[in-house]
Amino acid sequence: MSYTASNTRYATMTYHRSGNSGLKLPALSLGLWHNFGSNGNYENMKAMCFTAFDHGITHFDLANNYGPEPGSAERNFGRILREELHAYRDELVISTKAGYTMWDGPYGDWGSRKYLLASLDQSLKRMGVDYVDIFYHHRMDPNTPLEESMMALDTAVKSGKALYAGISRYDLEHTRQAMEILKELKCPFIIHQTRYSIFDRHIETDGVKSFTAQNGCGIIAFSPLAQGLLTDKYLKGIPEDSRIKTDGRFLHADQLTPESSRRSPH
């Protein structure tokens, strides 16, 4: 039986404009960094997407390298979109990113125009869509002129392959410069994605949070629960089915400290 969205999906969710743009994002988004790779359970992936959308979560956040293996999260989400969610595409905000290593050779990572635009084309193909709503540069590139990376985002938008531009994990100075470049290009730069939780509050002190607020750019957090450390999952040790035990790429046992246990809900 094909999926039909809940008739009450917009009854309780709160939506906020991203910066000064007209795009409204839900208070919670579904990030596909974990759980949607080739090692995941496809039925669980569908259930997560359906439950999210049924509760008004319209924003699905991806990146070219989400997996494992890289690209598999986009492929799996694309399959769900094609098989179950295609009728709701205009109700969804789909975002993806490029910046980390995606393929071998000198053109497979960082921030060159060649890499960013090729990666976006690959992402669109994997997901089976004509455009994404937001295309991010995923990290600062110390070896590519910032103008080149930002012009690639501008090209993505003006070609119709993305509706809005964003950046991720940029420091204050590069955020300021990126904003100036994109403003001059008249490119709709609306969002900055950064790590933010009670374990990592750097944007409150490094100037990024206040600068973006003052200049009409939205902030969206990734890992607000510190990959589960801020839940009750680890209060009694490390479960066998936990991310620390089964994956270990991004979350490690040495991050499970007495402080993290004290900050988790009891």
Predicted regions and their residues:
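Short, acidic/polar
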Residues: N39-F53, W110-M127, L146, T175-M179
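N-terminal small/glycine-rich loop or linker at the start of catalytic domains
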Residues: G19-G37, S95-G108, Y131, Y136
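Short, well-ordered coil/turn segments that N-cap beta-strands
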Residues: L23-L28, G56-T58, H86-L92, V129-D133, ...
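Conserved, mostly hydrophobic/aromatic
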Residues: S18, L30, M45, A52, ...
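N-terminal binding-site loop/beta-alpha segment at the start of enzyme catalytic domains
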Residues: M1-L92, K158
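Beta/alpha (TIM)-barrel catalytic core signal, keyed to glycine-rich beta->alpha loops juxtaposed to Asp/Glu
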Residues: S2-T12, M140-H266
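A short, structured active-site edge motif that brings together acidic residues
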Residues: R89-M102, Q193-Y196
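Alpha-helix N-cap and loop-to-helix initiation/capping positions
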Residues: G40-N44, S72, N76, Y107-Y115, ...
